[in-house]
């Protein structure tokens, strides 16, 4: 079976490693950047881990590599599993190596194809970059247990290049899910729905968090449903951008139903009742990735692209402003925008091409 290298040592990385080990008998190489090795070092100290899943599980021992070159050497698939704000640093390190025999996979993607185009040496670029809308699982690690809380029925991916049947088949077998192939990575960028629910939910929880109320209600049980009107408004604005650009996507609720199933008839009911989200804690601090990543690195760019194509996004703008106030930082200037991506002055077609890694 083709070698898999996993960059990052967080929840998704370890669940993917455990899934491959227990379902396919495959040991994956795991590497993490020196600047962010808390989880990596913790796993090393534990030795072996236990995958706990709804249908299968068991012990596995990740192959931890201190050296990036060793980790990716001979890998057919290199998985980038770090948050959006950590991807660029790793891509800069990958630029030192020949990736022309590998496929780079962003799990999930967030304009990763564009970042690769701007960062990696063309002659040594990967066969293709594949971006995913989401991770294959709802998951988290608790000490030595890697909890695969729920396996998504399907999730969406897109590639910068047409893949051979051999490469595509080798990729699809790595997952317990059925994959839905979108036409291009630009659609994936606008279908990463983290900025739809996360920022609205944590902003709804602001007073509770800042007052230090304990026990604090669960994030998806209490605060996302409390903000559901705002969540829905952001989602509608997102889809208006998608339609204006001629891309493909679905509503946040449609994705939730497609990924997880269940009997919920609307978004509020889903968030209030889905067991896979039931125990997810509310952040204890407002300086959290729900704002510092989902707003700063994704939503800001959505807003700027909307302005280019003449789409009104008042709810998105209000979230950017509130997040800026909370973080004491003008995210419309410090966030990832068109100018920081060398796309200032670009028209809609040029922006879509860039997001597709062209």
Swiss-Prot record:
Family annotation (Gene3D superfamilies): N-(1-d-carboxylethyl)-l-norvaline Dehydrogenase, domain 2, NAD(P)-binding Rossmann-like Domain
What does the annotation say about its assembly with partners?
Answer: Monomer.
Question: Sorted alphabetically, which Pfam families does this protein's record hold?
Answer: Octopine_DH
User: Has the keyword Oxidoreductase been applied to this entry?
Assistant: yes
EC number of the protein: 1.5.1.16, 1.5.1.11
Would you tell me the protein name for this molecule?
Answer: Protein ocs
Q: Which UniProt keywords apply?
A: Crown gall tumor, NAD, NADP, Oxidoreductase, Plasmid
The UniProt catalytic activity note for this protein reads: D-octopine + NAD(+) + H2O = L-arginine + pyruvate + NADH + H(+); D-lysopine + NADP(+) + H2O = L-lysine + pyruvate + NADPH + H(+)
**Species:** Agrobacterium tumefaciens (strain Ach5)
What does the record give as the function of this protein? Answer: Reductive condensation of pyruvate and arginine, lysine, histidine, or octopine to form octopine, lysopine, histopine, or octopinic acid, respectively. NADPH is the preferred cofactor, but NADH can also be used.
InterPro entries the record matches: 6-PGluconate_DH-like_C_sf, 6PGD_dom2, NAD(P)-bd_dom_sf, Opine/Lysopine_DH, Opine_DH
Under the GO molecular function aspect, what terms does this record hold?
D-lysopine dehydrogenase activity; D-octopine dehydrogenase activity
Similarity remark:
Belongs to the lysopine/nopaline/octopine/opine/vitopine dehydrogenases family.
Q: Is the keyword Ligase in the record?
A: no
């Amino acid at each position: 079976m083709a070698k898999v290298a996993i960059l990052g040592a967080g929840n998704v990385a370890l669940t993917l490693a455990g899934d491959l080990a227990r379902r396919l008998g495959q040991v994956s190489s795991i590497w993490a950047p020196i600047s962010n090795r808390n989880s990596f070092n913790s796993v090393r100290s534990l030795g072996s881990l236990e995958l706990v899943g709804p249908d299968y599980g068991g012990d596995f021992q990740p192959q931890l590599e201190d050296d990036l070159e060793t980790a990716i050497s001979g890998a057919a698939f290199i998985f980038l599993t770090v948050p959006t704000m950590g991807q660029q640093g790793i891509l800069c390190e990958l630029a030192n190596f020949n990736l022309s025999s590998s496929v780079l996979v962003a799990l999930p993607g967030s304009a990763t194809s564009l970042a690769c185009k701007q960062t990696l040496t063309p002659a040594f670029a990967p066969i293709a970059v594949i971006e995913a809308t989401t991770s294959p699982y709802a998951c988290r690690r608790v000490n030595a247990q890697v909890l695969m809380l729920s396996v998504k029925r399907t999730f969406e991916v897109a590639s910068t290049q047409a893949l051979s049947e051999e490469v595509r088949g080798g990729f699809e077998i790595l997952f317990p899910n059925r994959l839905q192939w979108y036409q291009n990575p630009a659609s994936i960028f606008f279908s990463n729905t983290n900025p739809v629910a996360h920022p609205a939910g944590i902003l709804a929880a602001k007073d509770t968090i800042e007052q230090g109320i304990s026990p604090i209600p669960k994030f998806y049980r209490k605060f996302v449903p409390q903000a559901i009107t705002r969540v829905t408004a952001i989602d509608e604005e997102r889809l208006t951008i998608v339609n204006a650009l001629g891309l493909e996507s679905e509503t946040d609720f449609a994705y939730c139903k497609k990924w997880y199933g269940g009997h919920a008839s609307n978004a509020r009911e889903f968030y209030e009742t889905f067991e896979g989200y039931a125990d997810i804690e509310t952040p204890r601090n407002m300086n959290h990735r729900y704002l510092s990543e989902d707003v700063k690195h994704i939503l800001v760019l959505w807003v700027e692209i909307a302005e280019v194509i003449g789409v009104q996004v008042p709810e998105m703008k209000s979230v950017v402003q509130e997040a800026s106030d909370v973080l004491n930082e003008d995210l419309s200037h410090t966030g990832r925008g068109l100018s920081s991506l060398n796309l200032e002055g670009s028209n809609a077609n040029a922006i879509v091409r860039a997001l597709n890694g062209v």
